[in-house]
Amino acid sequence: MLIFPLINDTSRKIIHIDMDAFFAAVEERDNPALKGKPVVIGKDPRETGGRGVVSTCNYEARKYGIHSAMSSKEAYERCPKAIFISGNYEKYRTVGDQIRRIFKRYTDLVEPMSIDEAYLDVTDNKLGIKSAVKIAKLIQHDIWKEVGLTCSAGVSYNKFLAKLASDFEKPHGLTLVLKEDALCFLAKLPIEKFHGVGKKSVEKLHDMGIYTGQDLLAVPEMTLIDHFGRFGFDLYRKARGISNSPVKSDRIRKSIGSERTYAKLLYQETDIKAEISKNAKRVAALLQDHKKLGKTIVLKVRYADFTTLTKRVTLPELTRNAAQIEQVAGDIFDSLSENPAGIRLLGVTMTNLEDKVADISLDL
């Protein structure tokens, strides 16, 4: 017996665009001498005493098992000839904006998921093109011609399948999943490839003998709900290619933050407070850009031994004032117990966001 109704809208035309090794690809585009060489976006461990982490890397570097969040030291050990580049995030953001403008030629229903990927609903697109595959090919062509980068595209009738499809053939691939092919497509996939299924859920599913989409399809709904609660129903739907989540052109931001990992550990309070100030000003600028105000300020501190502390303070009124954010974040730091270990990461985040309203004085 079904606990929740199964409604499968297969009438939509959804595209998921995922840029190929985006940061590294931008660097290769701007420096052709890098092409064909393993490129890692991250601090060179030879210059930082082995500290730092990999932000991303190109496909050549991935052949050596290098991946994002790996320590730069391990990346170097795996591939001593890798070229490490610190990265220019303002440049990447500018390129990302250029790509989003290309998306907007075809539809206003664009939901950016990050700087290098987005969902597009092209069911009723601006050019009246009936084929979503044709639109995906045009977007790939436009991005290559105007930006000099490649992307992979997934096309299907919902976001879940489109996302899986874009991962299926990279780089510069295009995969279509029709409604009549969805079950076959999902059946062959390892369960860890299912978007939205995290590491702990994968471990639990493996313990239940579920390794593929085909295995998941065979499990009764109530069994999944008993083991996973409401998420069990989501798994039941995913196995059947059902997801009616809309493409939201204006995603509701739940938080705005800025954090930085330091190649050289921070010990001195003056240095720590200076970095808190930089993060606070960055958050204030982002709040201004997104026309948001916030009430809860969160400070994140990660020490040399990777112990991570987060502490928050909720203000009585909304703000986006840099000095106020800096003051509160600094006060939070002062309230933490002293730790002789150096600090490797500091972050400041504003949550409890609301849209800007006219009757609030923002800079007082």
Swiss-Prot record:
The record marks F23 as: Substrate discrimination. Mg(2+) binds at D18, D116. It is found in: Cytoplasm. It holds the Pfam family IMS_HHH. It comes from the Bacteria. Keywords: Cytoplasm, DNA damage, DNA repair, DNA replication, DNA-binding, DNA-directed DNA polymerase, Magnesium, Metal-binding, Mutator protein, Nucleotidyltransferase, Transferase. GO terms for biological process: DNA-templated DNA replication; error-prone translesion synthesis; SOS response. The keyword Phosphoprotein does not apply. Its cofactor is Mg(2+). InterPro entries: DNA/RNA_pol_sf, DNA_pol_Y-fam_lit_finger_sf, DNA_pol_Y-fam_little_finger, DNA_polymerase-Y, DNApol_IV, PolY_HhH_motif, Rev_trsase/Diguanyl_cyclase, UmuC. CDD domains: PolY_Pol_IV_kappa. Residues 14-198 form the UmuC domain. It catalyses: DNA(n) + a 2'-deoxyribonucleoside 5'-triphosphate = DNA(n+1) + diphosphate. Binds 2 magnesium ions per subunit. GO terms for molecular function: damaged DNA binding; DNA-directed DNA polymerase activity; magnesium ion binding. The active site is at E117. Its EC number is 2.7.7.7. Its main location: cytoplasm. One of its GO terms (cellular component) is cytosol. HAMAP family: DNApol_IV. Poorly processive, error-prone DNA polymerase involved in untargeted mutagenesis. Copies undamaged DNA at stalled replication forks, which arise in vivo from mismatched or misaligned primer ends. These misaligned primers can be extended by PolIV. Exhibits no 3'-5' exonuclease (proofreading) activity. May be involved in translesional synthesis, in conjunction with the beta clamp from PolIII. Monomer. This is DNA polymerase IV. It comes from Streptococcus pyogenes serotype M18 (strain MGAS8232). The lineage of its organism: Bacteria, Bacillati, Bacillota, Bacilli, Lactobacillales. The gene is dinB.
